[in-house]
Amino acid sequence: MSDIELSGLLPDDQDDRILAENVHPTKWVNPPANGRYNIVVLGAGTAGLITAIVGASLGAKVALVEKHLMGGDCLNVGCVPSKSVIRAARAWADLRSAEQFGLRIPAGVKYDFGAVMARMRKLRARISHNDSAQRYTNLGVDVFIGSGRFASAETIQVEGVAGNRTLRFARAAICTGTRASSPAIPGLKEAGYLTNETVFALRELPHRIGVIGAGPIGCELAQAFARFGSHVYVIEALHGILSNEDRDAAQVVEQQMMKD
């Protein structure tokens, strides 16, 4: 899985090899183009997978194109890994506050951050079959691993090591998602930094971490790392955290984060 390793998202361990073989199989061979598709879906994240499977279940001829990891952010670098880490952080926080409920916790109880991240990778690998190329093929979707581009108003060209194909379509669904932009901060590139994607490749807890951006992702990661003991700085250009949310709700979150 050399191209996946280079992305910095997946450390080379057994669980991530299982994940990669499900969502970006190295020996995948793209099927022959099957005439004119009712719909070609670009991107196999949450939106793309749902579009493809609903179309196929209704009897449509569907092609699904993915150049990176099937499952998108949710499986690989979003919902699944973040909630695993957050759950572990909450368990640790509950344990530390257990005495206020009359529970006696033995002195010297510790957590293992490496084990927390290993559990996350194991859970992610275990459920990755649900978003795999083979499963969607079995469900009647033609899966193409490679980069797709519009060659005309009715064709998409797929290029990649799994085989180049030209796909004709009646409709196309663009489900390519988004990616966080890196702020233009002098020296940031030279200093090195994590993103909401690469942070889940950590194996050791950082002693100090600055989180730039206080949206939902920034806040949940900041709270999790703080609960594990990192000294966390949250930096937000706008007024307050969760600026797009109800202010009363955002203040409740802010107060809890400050306690953590």
Residue map of PLM features:
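Glycine-rich flavin
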Residues: 2-37, 50-60, 65-205, 238-242, ...
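A general secondary-structure boundary signal
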Residues: 36-39, 231
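The conserved SAM/SAH-binding core of class I Rossmann-like methyltransferase domains
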Residues: 42, 65, 235
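Generic signature of intrinsically disordered, low-complexity, basic-rich segments
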Residues: 42-43, 94
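Glycine-rich Rossmann-fold phosphate-binding loop(s) that bind the pyrophosphate
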Residues: 43-46, 67-68, 212-215
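Rossmann-like NAD(P)H-binding beta-loop-alpha module
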Residues: 203-245
